[in-house]
Amino acid sequence: MFKDLTQYGIIPRKNGRETIKNIPEKYMSHFIRGYADGDGCIHIVYLKNYLHWLPEFKAEIASCTKVLKQIQKIIKKHIDLEGKIYIHKQTKSHEGGKLIFAGAIRAMKYLEWIYKDSNESMRLDYKYKKYLKYLQIREKHFK
């Protein structure tokens, strides 16, 4: 399995040399979901807007900048969605950051794409449940 993953650019211990390569296009959303399951998060926070508390949605992937730019390009190509990259860590060997999809529309478009055609054997249950919670909250607040 280790050998199989290295042919796609997946290597242990982040060091700034990570890259994404040779992933068949038809599996790209599944690959990105798996990457996000390992190094991503889904946030639902409530912010006060005058008289009401409104939900704010955010989905993130953390990695080295090189991989984040590749993922950003892949997502732009597949669903015409561009997330924002924030650099938060620089070392001698690499810089790391987060690719963020913030807001109800952007976060949902990204999450719908990565969870489309997935099943419970292909995803982390607790992250998928957060996605389902997103759907419920969106239905309630953004009709």
Please name every model-derived segment.
Residues M1-K143:
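Internal intein/HINT superfamily modules and their associated LAGLIDADG
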